[in-house]
Amino acid sequence: MRKALSLVILTMVSGSAFAADSVPVESVKALAALDNNGGWPPIFDNTPTPLMRRYFSPAFNQAWAAAMKHNKDFPVFDADPLTGEQNGGGIKSVSAEMEAPNRVAAKMTLHDGSERSVEFLMIHSAAGEWFINDIIYPHQKSLRVVLDEAGR
């Protein structure tokens, strides 16, 4: 009985850890939960942070680093990168679902009461990990396009 209970607990714990790191929807939700103030920290900085390396693709992080070299000359992106909004106060709640095999559609309620829908374009690494490769906002350029243009 003790072995069976231990096995069930181990499966639950390891399953939760596996889901948070490898399933795209859970990764987006976990990252959104960290964006509670609407600013860049703790997720974003002028150089890729540990959280960026965990949740975003290497190519995204390279584009971010190249673009941010110009951030002192002009503001590369002066909004919350996860929402594309200025002064939203961060993400209060999020619902997300797979829209396509590599796309997570997220609807977010911000702390200012507004709602925002964005899509996270995901890539699957050879090691089996999922990473965000772009954030697509309605009615404006995607984050990756902004970064690529600024990094030239």
Predicted regions span which residues?
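Surface-exposed, charged secondary-structure patches
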Residues: 56-114
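Short beta-strand edge segments in extracellular beta-sheet folds
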Residues: 121-123
